[in-house]
Structures are given as C-alpha cells and as structure tokens.
C-alpha cells in the first residue's frame, strides 16, 4: 500500500504475496500505459512514467511486459482509462484515500463502495477526507548511496521539505510543485532512486488499538484487491506488536 511504510511487511506476508501476485503486474502495466498516454513514452521526459517503470522493476516485472505496456499507449490500441479518487472512513474513524483507474466508472464505484461496506467502512463524498492529507512528492534511495548528513544537505539544496534516513534508506519529501526539480537534482547526484512519485501523505496520524487495527488492515486488503484500484492511503498508525503479528 503506497504511502504507509508500516504495511511493507504486512502486505508482503506469506500467503498475501501469492494472493495478489496475479494482479500486481496488470496494475503496474495499466499505470505504465496511462502514464505514457498522458505524457510522452520517453521516461527521461516523463516523471510519472519513470516512476511507474521503477515500481515495476521493484516487483521484478519482466522488461518485455514493461515495453509492451508502453507500446499500448503509443499504438493507441489500449483501453482509455479514467482516473478517479475515492474517499472514505474505516473503523475507528480512520480516513482513507483510494486512487483508481477504470474504463467503467459505475463498475468501479460499485466495487469500491462494496469493499468499504463489507469491511466496516463507509464511502464518503469527494473532499470529505482529502483535506487531512497533502499531495507531495517522494523520492527514496538506498541507505548506501550517501550518509544521512550528505543526503540532508543535498535534499535541502534541491528544495525538499523533509528527509528521513535510517537503516532502510533515505526518504525525501517535497511539495508537489517542486517534485520535478527536486527529483531531477537528486537523481543527477545519487543515481536512480528505489522509488519515486506523488503520494497522499497524512498531515497527522491517529493511533488505533489492535482490534481496530486488524479491521483496518482487512479493509485495506479488500479495497486493494479490486482490479481497478491502484493505491490506498491512510491516516492511522499501528502498534509495533500488531505490525509484527500481522507480518508473520
């Protein structure tokens, strides 16, 4: 689930990977095609396409699949997908933003609404929770590309707003309008990032108890299982004990 590092282990736990693997490549391919259609098929000139290709590589998507997805956009032989944002609430009053790409708005709306309802959540009007999030750019590098001080200095010089460095790597956050320049400057200095793109970042997170946390995890999984859903962003935090338990 994009935008929430706590879920890295949970969403990749044993069994979960096999359950979603068949859908991962199709979703990645769809994003590549959409990005190439909206911009240029040259990733060096299209930040969104570059981000989509990096995400595909991170999931070990074959090069042929990536090239095929780009050609679908160039050849104009693919479906025309509409990008839609849904907003809603989960157990405990948690807020969620869902990004989808669809060729059938009515079908997707019905599927997303059903996913919320069956898991104890509720779909809300557009704008109901978006004000709790900021649209920001994120660029992430491996820990060994630089030490924390060097990365911080470079990121600030490039115009970034925040840098978090730990054993897992460096995550740089910047304003949406500055994303292109910041990512370009950092890539020129440190090379290709592990991931990059625009996300919805919660302004504040709410703590939930473990029982509510498990319900929210199930809600997110059900929503992400929808074929048209690309990303889910949340504003809740889980206890370390629950993260360890659910990631087992």
Curated annotation (Swiss-Prot):
InterPro entries: Integrase-like_N, TACO1_YebC-like_2nd/3rd_dom, TACO1_YebC_N, Transcrip_reg_TACO1-like, Transcrip_reg_TACO1-like_dom3, YebC-like
Superkingdom of origin: Bacteria
TM regions (residue ranges): none
One GO term of the biological process aspect: regulation of DNA-templated transcription
Keyword Transcription regulation: yes
Keywords carried by this UniProt record: Cytoplasm, DNA-binding, Transcription, Transcription regulation
GO MF entries: DNA binding
GO cellular component: cytosol
Localization of this protein: Cytoplasm
UniProt xrefs under Pfam families: TACO1_YebC_N (PF20772), Transcrip_reg (PF01709)
Family indicated by similarity: Belongs to the TACO1 family.
UniProt cross-references to PANTHER family, sorted A to Z: TRANSCRIPTIONAL REGULATORY PROTEIN YEBC-RELATED, TRANSLATIONAL ACTIVATOR OF CYTOCHROME C OXIDASE 1
Protein name (record): Probable transcriptional regulatory protein Mpop_0922
Species name: Methylorubrum populi (strain ATCC BAA-705 / NCIMB 13946 / BJ001) (Methylobacterium populi)
């Amino acid at each position: 689930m994009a935008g929430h590092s706590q879920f890295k282990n949970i969403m990749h736990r044993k069994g979960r990977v096999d359950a979603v693997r068949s859908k991962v490549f199709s979703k990645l391919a769809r994003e590549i095609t959409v990005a190439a259609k909206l911009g240029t098929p040259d990733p060096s000139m299209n930040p969104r396409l570059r981000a989509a290709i990096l995400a595909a590589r991170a999931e070990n998507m074959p090069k042929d699949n990536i090239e095929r997805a780009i050609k679908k956009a160039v050849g104009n032989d693919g479906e025309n997908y509409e990008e839609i944002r849904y907003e809603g609430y989960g157990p405990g009053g948690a807020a969620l933003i869902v990004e989808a790409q669809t060729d059938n708005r009515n079908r997707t709306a019905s599927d997303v609404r059903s996913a919320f309802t069956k898991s104890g959540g509720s779909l809300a009007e557009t704008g109901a929770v978006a004000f709790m999030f900021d649209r920001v750019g994120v660029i992430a590098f491996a820990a060994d590309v630089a030490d924390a001080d060097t990365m911080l200095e470079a990121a600030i010089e490039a115009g970034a707003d925040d840098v978090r460095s730990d054993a897992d790597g460096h995550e740089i956050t910047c304003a949406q309008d500055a994303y292109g320049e910041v990512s370009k400057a950092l890539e020129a200095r440190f090379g290709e990032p592990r991931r990059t793109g625009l996300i919805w970042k919660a302004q504040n997170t709410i703590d939930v108890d473990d029982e509510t946390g498990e319900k929210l995890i199930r809600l997110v999984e059900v929503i992400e299982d929808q074929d048209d859903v690309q990303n889910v962003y949340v504003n809740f935090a889980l206890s370390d004990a629950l993260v360890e338990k659910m990631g087992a």
